[in-house]
């Protein structure tokens, strides 16, 4: 918001992270937009950034594919078919975005060489030449130390009311952290 972005395209693997009516990205965005007229326009789609985004392989719904195509200037530029919000962003990503980011999810792509390679390909295909990629990840040493007294299979977690909102499961038996 303070960076004065004009548009945000969000892609999340977990559909609930986008569409949950209470605290999904869409609900939070709409609530913030009511309060702040400086909020950038935003579109959110359900997908997997370890699969190709621009060719829609990584996009899970037909509506999401239509959104991605429109943002990258592919297909018919028709407000009636696309809807006002999507139509407004038609072609915004044709040359890539000034900023692409991955917040606290980059570790998922290291499941395999193929996934990390495709993720990096997405970054290069969707970031404008001269643009920036911003990634955040957890501090491995801090998490290792937090999990030190946990047995394999036990976890750290945070609840909000009665809903688990965060959990990390210890899936290793190493006793020393090797960076």
What are these model-derived regions, one by one?
Residues 1-7:
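Conserved SAM-binding loop of SAM-dependent methyltransferases across substrates and taxa
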Residues 7-15, 46:
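Conserved SAM-binding motif I beta-strand of class I
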Residues 14, 24, 139:
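Residues in the short beta-alpha loop(s) of Rossmann-like NAD(P)-binding domains
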Residues 17, 52-54, 108-110, 141-145:
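Short catalytic/ligand-binding loop motif for oxyanion handling, primarily in non-cytosolic enzymes
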Residues 90-96, 107, 113-132:
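A short glycine-rich, Lys/Arg-flanked "PGG" loop and its adjoining helix->strand segment in the class I
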Residues 136, 140-179:
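SAM-dependent methyltransferase
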